[in-house]
Amino acid sequence: MASLPHCLSARPLVVAAAPGRPGPGPGPWLRGGARRRNAAFSAGNAGRRVGLRRSVASAVEVGVGEDEEEGVEEEEEEVEAVVMPERYALGGACRVLAGMPAPLGATALDGGVNFAVYSAGASAASLCLFTPDDLEADEVTEEVPLDPLFNRTGNVWHVFIEGELHNMLYGYRFDGMFAPHCGQYFDVSNVVVDPYAKAVISRGEYGVPGPGGDCWPQMAGMIPLPYSTFDWQGDLPLRYPQKDLVIYEMHLRGFTKHSSSNVEHPGTYIGAISKLDYLKELGVNCVELMPCHEFNELEYFSCSSKMNFWGYSTINFFSPMIRYSSGGIRNCGRDAINEFKTFVREAHKRGIEVIMDVVFNHTAEGNEKGPILSFRGIDNSTYYMLAPKGEFYNYSGCGNTFNCNHPVVREFIVDCLRYWVTEMHVDGFRFDLASIMTRGCSLWDPVNVYGSPVEGDMTTTGTPLATPPLIDMISNDPILGDVKLIAEAWDAGGLYQVGQFPHWKIWSEWNGKYRDIVRQFIKGTDGFAGGFAECLCGSPHLYQAGGRKPWHSINFVCAHDGFTLADLVTYNKKYNSSNGEDNRDGENHNLSWNCGEEGEFAGLSVKRLRKRQMRNFFVSLMVSQGVPMFYMGDEYGHTKGGNNNTYCHDHYVNYFRWDKKEESSDLQRFCSLMTKFRKQCESLGLADFPTAQRLHWHGHQPGKPDWSETSRFVAFSTKDETKGEIYVAFNASHLPAVVGLPERPGYRWEPLVDTGKPAPYDFLTDDLPDRAHAVHLFSHFLNSNLYPMLSYSSIILELQPDD
């Protein structure tokens, strides 16, 4: 809890005085001008004017110097100040003071709350206070006009409310030019949300419209308390080396919302805590949460029955999603904050880091037809990338583009990231469409917008920058330099930066090229053996020359975008008609293969092949250098029925099916054993790219790799500090093969993984009752340094001393 600053405590009552303003004489204060300074609340609200009579002696108390008294008549003059009415909602009388311009947001101090908000273009502003009941009724409880002389410093509007504001909410009105063609959307009829609000209150129940069926009811920010009651129980960052991570991409609501989860609060932070032990058993040590910032799941509901389930449409970046909380809007959103903190704390107790998926590329305000919620009504031309006639650049594909490299916006983003690290204890961030953060900003300056010469070149709005100020600022921040930073290194405007994202040797990337090459090779496409080998080595062709390491590559085969792992081997084309866009949405370039028949209902041989292929993909993921990431449900074969863009469905298609997990326990067992095997093998999570001294390539014969256009076989052996040596091979051909193994005198190769075998023999654990018999079946091959592989299969062998 901070103390009340001297500039506030020294000026206890009279709003006419300008705390912190240097050296004005008494004239402007006492000769009538004071009567228009913050003298009353807006019409229609319950404010009242309080007349005060004071002498020049009292003027000295509020900052008039003794030398300024000279020549002032000793006469009393009525000066107006503001005292907020004694209403139950405000817990007694409150007084209005000028406040401070920093920090931005609402800050609880001794004796009251300081409010500060940036708006360069507004001509007038007022602070709106709500009780929860008044917010639900869409009524402002109290409104405090802000005087541009006393309540504005530079482009920051500020005010200090002295008194008790417990269980109150707030927002702002801004007046100014409403001229979309000039990039301005000021509208005094709107109460907008402070971008720095730490919780945003609107609807309490997920998926339920507000009063009168309103999908966009009035929103307001939580006014913070001067103290925190949350007990972190000594929680500290885990700080795992990134090379040791196994990342699980999950949707927090979808993880436990299905009835088969059997948790007390399904679809919430608390519900997810109940299943953290499952993730630990799965071998996961990091979860990447799909968006948990405040968004409106009913964003599309007024024009269709679709839900914004995924949440990639942020309203407020500081606030955790209120309706993911079992408490909802209770306690003005503080319960939601504490539940998110509890999730992080309990994840850390189980050795699981928490990475947040953040969407700093656009907001829920959309294009010029979108709602005015926050940024647009505060300063549209600052927060959004605009064209010369006010049009919104749309590099996000969602109607607007956040103006990330604007000085004010990049400071906002860094402040937000710092908050989630220091206050919420998250371990890192995955930046959605991160290439937008490398584009040049618009400053709403005709020279800048149309292009200004920079060292002979033209830098226009949206131009990719070699050293983007925002990325530079994040990379060199003393707080953020120690957290995981992952870029989705492309955007919807055609900028693709995989392997080339500005990185400062800190940033990792979702390796989309890994995904595409591995999909091509595993399904048996010619010409990808060499590329697949590069992927197994951590993609040195992408990262080594730039000074990065294998662990800067986040390897994945499937993610929330696109097919699930099961659908990748079941469908050759997408089936997105249920999205209501005539199957036009979603990716067409899926690189999938249905294994011979389209859809779930296929013959037995096709289903067996699909099981092999899912295991092959998972093996490739776990034996590749770099950081493996897999999507929630892929470990049991979750299907979305061929829909590769399920952003709008709040039902079973996006829910983790705990009942199906039990039915598909064989695949779940295999995936869990593979993640643990990776952790046991020092050689599979190297700090640097493997060298020829450690890793050896093989073909059907040892030491003779085949990198030809028609090759569909890749194998390698690698020395390992814990396992001694392992041999890994992939046969992506439609034909079986007998593979020659490297000779190791005094040792023998012993099978561990064979995706061509039925469960549980696909992974031979030491506790398998008939393991010895299963190994013996291959002895006549292994004694000759041979191993038979089925078509479309992969194997892992371990080197053991000869008996």
Swiss-Prot record:
UniProt-annotated catalytic positions: 432 (nucleophile), 488 (proton donor)
Protein name stated in the entry: Isoamylase 1, chloroplastic
Transit peptide as recorded in UniProt: 1-54
Biological process annotations from GO: amylopectin biosynthetic process; starch biosynthetic process; starch catabolic process
Activity regulation description: Inhibited by copper chloride, mercury chloride, ammonium molybdate and para-chloromercuribenzoate.
Complex and partners: Forms a homo-pentamer and a hetero-hexamer composed of five ISA1 and one ISA2. Interacts with FLO6/SIP4.
Assigned keywords, A-Z: Carbohydrate metabolism, Chloroplast, Glycosidase, Hydrolase, Plastid, Starch biosynthesis, Transit peptide
Record site feature (Transition state stabilizer), residues: 561
Tissue: Highly expressed in developing endosperm. Expressed at low levels in leaves.
Compartments in which it is found: Plastid, Chloroplast
Alphabetized PANTHER family for the sequence: GLYCOGEN DEBRANCHING ENZYME (PTHR43002)
Catalytic reactions on record: Hydrolysis of (1->6)-alpha-D-glucosidic branch linkages in glycogen, amylopectin and their beta-limit dextrins
Pathway named in the protein's UniProt entry: Glycan biosynthesis; starch biosynthesis
UniProt-recorded Gene Ontology molecular function terms: isoamylase activity
TM segment ranges: none
SUPFAM superfamilies: (Trans)glycosidases (SSF51445), E set domains (SSF81296), Glycosyl hydrolase domain (SSF51011)
Organism: Oryza sativa subsp. japonica (Rice)
Enzyme class: hydrolase
GO CC entries: chloroplast isoamylase complex; isoamylase complex
Noted pH dependence of activity: Optimum pH is 6.5 at 30 degrees Celsius.
